[in-house]
């Protein structure tokens, strides 16, 4: 009687073994893959062991968090046929052998989980199929496609008497995963103070560098401020700030000093006097990163480098933004050189202006490569512009219907960026217009005088006659 339970257990184990033999033996696994680079060929290999007859192999791509399984390849052993479900991919897969699928040119959109399902016949009946599956996550990387370095808050003016902050923005797009971005100055890595990211609502704008103003504020010495204000007052006595020639060395010419608290600064082409309270020591750099996911799975990274600008040492400094990414064999980089504008090239059309013509004066280049983008201000020396304004901001100055009174007038173009300022002058020569008799044009270049009066009287008489 006591042997009965043991006998029953042995019978159950024997029955289970018989059922296992009837179903057949099947194990499935997919060989792991390291991250792959977009554009490379990828082989998904499904290994399985069985002592039964194979029914089919089906490959699935899993999307939407596992809720959707899309067939990408089927092998049907019953009919010994291969069938592709990847019409949209135009049969991008190649069957190497029964359990392997090859993607010759993988894309970022191929990133995600895949499953291999293998079915064998049940030994007891061919109506049943025993299934087993394996899965793998295909991690597709993509190197950055573009890199660009721009200046925030550009264009911006040159400041003589107040130190100002400057921000370089490195924009790296198209990478997956997000790359590592850092800056160098003159080939040497910059040891910057890292800052936490701003909220997503503000981190995407290049213009948003204002939060650094309080971080980089420098205390201004009262004595130096008074001296600077005295210089400013001296310059404005003539009605407009003078410009000054840049020194060829850090030591200024003693002949320029009239007295200890003032300077006599003659007006010249190039203007560049630097804030006296900007220290010559190494600047303190601050670095901030922001990341914006793209709809295609890539990430746009923006690195913002901010410091207190010192035109004396920062002018002609080479800054480079470098990118490291696992999909790149060597760093990717973009370079900019901070340069103050020098020698604007002025073009005037028409080349021979006549009374009544519309004259355009345009800045179409510099003697050097300028960065960041400069801003332009036009003024008329000794008088106001034709429209009555004191100055005009823009690259092109338009004078409509120029009168003869503008002959010989001088125009000043001030081009400036945070590194410096330069003035260029051009004189307008206005020739007589044979279509407009001398003395018949007004200050806007339109016809007036006796001829205009006679024409008005004729029109008035015509109207009176028609009314009577």
Swiss-Prot record:
Membrane topology, as annotated: Lipid-anchor; GPI-anchor
Family matches, as InterPro entries: Ig-like_dom, Ig-like_dom_sf, Ig-like_fold, Ig_sub, Ig_V-set, Nectin/Nectin-like
GO BP, sorted A to Z: homophilic cell adhesion via plasma membrane adhesion molecules; synapse maturation; trans-synaptic signaling, modulating synaptic transmission
Leader peptide range in chain numbering: 1-24
Localization terms from the record: Postsynaptic cell membrane
UniProt keyword Signal present: yes
Domain Ig-like: 25-132, 344-429
Disulfide bonds: 46-116
Tissue specificity comment: Expressed in brain.
Domain of life: Eukaryota
Keywords, in A-Z order: Cell membrane, Disulfide bond, Glycoprotein, GPI-anchor, Immunoglobulin domain, Lipoprotein, Membrane, Postsynaptic cell membrane, Repeat, Signal, Synapse
Pfam entry (one): V-set
Record-level GO cellular component terms: external side of plasma membrane; inhibitory synapse; postsynaptic density membrane; presynaptic membrane
PANTHER family: IMMUNOGLOBULIN SUPERFAMILY MEMBER 21, NECTIN-RELATED
Comment text on domains: Ig-like 1 domain is indispensable for synaptogenic activity whereas Ig-like 2 domain is secondarily responsible for the activity.
Function recorded in the entry: Involved in synaptic inhibition in the brain. Selectively regulates inhibitory presynaptic differentiation through interacting with presynaptic NRXN2.
Quaternary data: Interacts (Ig-like 1 domain) with NRXN2 (via Laminin G-like 1 domain) in a trans-interaction manner.
Official protein name in the record: Immunoglobulin superfamily member 21
């Amino acid at each position: 009687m006591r042997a009965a339970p043991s006998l029953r257990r042995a019978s159950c184990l024997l029955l289970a073994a018989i059922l296992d033999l009837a179903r057949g033996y099947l194990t499935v696994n997919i060989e792991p893959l390291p991250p792959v680079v977009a554009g490379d060929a990828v082989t998904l290999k499904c290994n399985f062991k069985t002592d039964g007859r194979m029914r089919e192999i089906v490959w699935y791509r899993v999307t939407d968090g596992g809720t959707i399984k899309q067939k990408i390849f089927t092998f049907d052993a019953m009919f010994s046929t291969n069938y592709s479900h990847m019409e949209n991919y135009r049969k991008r897969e190649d069957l190497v052998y029964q359990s392997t699928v090859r993607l010759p040119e993988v894309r970022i959109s191929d990133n995600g989980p895949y499953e291999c399902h293998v079915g064998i016949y049940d030994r007891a009946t061919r109506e049943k199929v025993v299934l087993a599956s394996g899965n793998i996550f295909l991690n597709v990387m993509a190197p950055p496609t573009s890199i660009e370095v721009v200046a925030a808050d550009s264009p911006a003016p040159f400041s003589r008497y107040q130190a100002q902050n400057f921000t370089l923005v490195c924009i790296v797009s198209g990478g997956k995963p997000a790359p590592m971005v850092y800056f160098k100055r003159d080939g040497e890595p910059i040891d910057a103070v890292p800052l936490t990211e701003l909220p997503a609502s503000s981190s995407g704008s290049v213009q948003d560098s204002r939060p650094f103003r309080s971080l980089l504020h420098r205390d201004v010495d009262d004595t130096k401020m008074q001296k600077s204000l005295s210089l400013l007052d001296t310059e404005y006595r003539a009605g407009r700030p003078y410009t000054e020639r840049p020194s060829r060395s850090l030591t200024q010419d003693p002949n320029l000093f009239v007295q200890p608290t003032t300077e006599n600064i003659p007006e010249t082409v190039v203007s560049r006097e630097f804030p006296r309270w900007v220290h010559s020591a190494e600047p303190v750099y601050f670095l901030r990163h922001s990341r914006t996911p793209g709809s295609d799975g890539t990430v746009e990274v923006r690195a913002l480098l901010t410091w207190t600008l010192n035109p004396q040492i920062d002018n002609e400094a080479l800054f480079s933004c470098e990118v490291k990414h696992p999909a790149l064999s060597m760093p990717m980089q973009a370079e900019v050189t901070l340069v103050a504008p020098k020698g604007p090239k002025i073009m005037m059309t028409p080349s021979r202006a006549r009374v009544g013509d519309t004259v355009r004066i345009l800045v179409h280049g510099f003697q050097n490569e300028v960065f960041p983008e400069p801003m332009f201000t036009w003024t008329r020396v000794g008088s106001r512009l034709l429209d009555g304004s004191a100055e005009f901001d823009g690259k092109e100055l338009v004078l409509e219907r120029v009168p003869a009174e503008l002959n010989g007038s001088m125009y000043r173009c001030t081009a400036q960026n945070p590194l410096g300022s330069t003035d260029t002058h051009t004189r307008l020569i206005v020739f007589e217009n044979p279509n407009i008799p001398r003395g018949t044009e007004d200050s806007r270049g339109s016809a007036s005088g006796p001829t205009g009066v006679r024409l008005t009287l004729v029109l008035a008489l015509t109207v009176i006659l028609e009314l009577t």
